[in-house]
Regions:
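Fe-S-dependent hydro-lyases/dehydratases of central metabolism
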Residues: 1-415
Length: 415
């Protein structure tokens, strides 16, 4: 019987064939911890009685949510992280230059076929390069740091097939939002989403990253894309035979298959305050807004900034509207400067901030107050995420967000 991609990855790790529902113990290839959870991971690690890391080179600590510190307690997290890294010999510590999920693939910490866990729900992002990656809590992370292993239940797989050519103003963000709307917030709970089809094959790794990042918003355990020549170039590797095999077999067993025609997609938004509350932008046109945020681990990459700059070139942000742009990494920031993207954004009236999570987690500048509306390119629009519980958050693609910044209201990027 054939295998799905997730079944192949787990089988390669544990050395035996697996099926959905099996509970197995895997050897972990890499872990990621960010600044919010490091104090709790450190405390739990020592509480469990561990005296050394299973492999200091396989652990990555990243400060991104709380930098630069904006609240008095933030520095406690940095001190706890630095102390833990020094005590246990962690060398892979990144203190100020990148969002965790961007770094893990950008810096080569994750390779196709790897099994990776992180203390963040959007760890599903690394499926963009064909890795099984998933978010866990700090107790589980402490255990992995001491043992290098983790138990998992093999998930069922939902196959998502997308064929055809996307309309000009549709981005991968529109695709994943539509899928989340169709599945519902719990429609893929503890299941793998396996993406395939000509549209997916033609996507950049960055576009795949956006989709893998948001898979958790439908409850998915992980999201997986077949590694190809684009993956190899992005990861700066030559794919081995196992990595080349990471595609779903024709006779594999899937929970279900969902098929889309790319030409049927249109710009969409997730409306307040649920990620699965999806509407076409055309249905929302004319809704006045106060702010636009372009950035995050979902849409803060170079192609996202390029897309926004193309829309904003030669235009101005509307009066009384704030546009905040936050690159996902220092590398992206510098590339955007070199290409003139930052000049275009600044000339349009954007406020450009340091790389990091920024407004997405409501910790940096830009939080909003009662009655305000924001169009944002991040992955969640829950109540209170970007300010008070009476802020309305609309999630959209970078192209749509940029168009809204110019209009001062929700507008279709085609206009």
């Amino acid at each position: 019987m054939g295998e799905t991609v997730i079944e192949k990855i787990i089988r390669n790790n544990v050395g035996k064939t697996v099926k959905p529902g099996d509970i197995v113990t895997v050897n972990v290839d890499r872990v990621m911890i960010h600044d919010i959870f490091i104090p709790f991971v450190a405390e739990k690690f020592e509480e469990m009685g561990f005296t050394k890391l299973w492999d200091p080179d396989k652990a990555v600590l990243i400060y991104d949510h709380l930098v630069p510190a904006s609240q008095l307690d933030d520095t406690r997290h940095f001190h706890a992280g630095d102390a833990f890294a020094r005590k246990y010999g962690m060398k892979n510590v990144h203190r100020s230059d990148v969002i965790c999920h961007q770094l893990m693939t950008e810096a080569g910490y994750v390779k196709p076929g790897n099994i990776v866990f992180g203390t963040d729900s959007h760890t599903t992002t690394y499926g963009c390069v064909g890795a099984f990656s998933s978010g866990i809590g700090y107790t589980e992370m402490a255990s992995i740091l001491g043992t290098g292993t983790m138990w998992i239940k093999v998930p069922e797989t939902i196959k998502v097939v997308i064929e055809g050519e996307l309309p000009e103003n549709v981005m991968s963000k529109d695709i994943i939002l539509r899928l989340i709307g169709d599945l519902g917030a719990d429609g893929a709970t503890y299941r793998a989403l396996e993406f395939t089809g000509s549209t997916v094959k033609n996507m950049t790794v960055a576009s795949r990253m956006t989709m893998a990042n948001m898979a958790i918003e439908a409850g998915a355990k992980c999201a997986l894309f077949t590694p190809d020549e684009k993956t190899a170039e992005y990861c700066d590797i030559e794919l081995n035979e196992f990595q080349k095999s990471l595609t779903g077999d024709e006779d594999a067993t899937y929970m279900k298959t969902i098929t889309y025609r790319a030409e049927d997609f249109a710009p969409v938004m997730a409306c307040p305050s649920q990620v699965d509350k999806i509407k076409n932008v055309s249905e929302l046109e004319g809704t006045e807004i106060d702010q636009v945020f372009i950035g995050s681990c979902t849409n803060g990459r170079l192609e996202d900034l390029r897309a926004a700059a193309e829309v904003l070139k030669g235009k101005k942000v509307a009066d009384y509207v704030k546009l905040i742009v936050t690159p996902a990494s220092r590398k992206i920031y510098r590339q955007a400067i070199a290409e003139g993207i930052m000049d275009t954004l600044a000339e349009a009236g954007a406020m450009i901030t340091h790389p990091g999570c920024g407004l997405c987690c409501g910790r940096a500048g830009g939080i909003l107050t009662d009655g305000e509306r924001v169009v944002a390119t991040n992955n969640r629009n829950f109540l209170g995420r970007m300010g008070t519980s009476k802020v309305e958050i609309y999630l959209a693609s970078p192209k749509t967000a940029a168009a809204c910044a110019i209009a001062g209201k929700i507008v279709n990027p085609e206009k």
